[in-house]
From Swiss-Prot:
Name the UniProt record assigns to this protein: Neuroblastoma suppressor of tumorigenicity 1
Residues of the signal peptide: 1-17
UniProt-listed Pfam families: DAN
Keyword set includes Secreted: yes
Task of the protein: May act as a tumor suppressor. Cytokine that has an axial patterning activity. Acts like bone morpho-genetic protein (BMP) antagonist in embryonic explants. Blocks the bmp2 activity.
Subcellular location: Secreted
Main location: secreted
Residues annotated as domain CTCK: 34-123
SUBUNIT field: Interacts with bmp2; the interaction is blocked in presence of nog.
Disulfide bond annotation, renumbered to this chain: 34-84, 48-98, 58-117, 62-119, 81-122
GO cellular component: extracellular space
MF annotations from Gene Ontology: cytokine activity
Amino acid sequence: MTVWLLIGFLLPVAIFAAPPINRLALFPDKSAWCEAKNITQIVGHSGCESKSIQNRACLGQCFSYSVPNTFPQSTESLVHCDSCMPIDSVWDVVTLECPGNEEFPRVDKLVEKILQCSCQACGKELSQEGAMFNVYLNTAEETLSPAETLGHHHHRPPAREEDSPAQSQREGESEE
């Protein structure tokens, strides 16, 4: 009986400890692990030539558990979930060539380059939209609409001689 009282008291204390959890009392010989592993990533886009880049992927085994509940509920639900995910990353622009596409001969793809991984609470993900928006704020090539910052960016070909003088002047002003 005292063992169950002890477990009933210590289990909630252990459960509500600051995440991530590296060891569980029920499995003292097992520990969580998460690391960034080198990979070759293929970046592609329809109608464009793919590129191979060096990147990292998060790989590991993190703890999650759910303790049976009671009704009526006497304590908060005892559920915990950790996942191996990036804790440090940068966004790079990878430019793909699109031969045969005169309107958009190149496409920029944003790629998350993972630097470091660890066990983090499930659902805790970095804001991809905010990170992508910052990448485009720091590039001075073109002004983009918010919709363009959420996926890929098309490069328009340089102005040709047959373009109108007003169009050529506008493009010249945007480069200065």
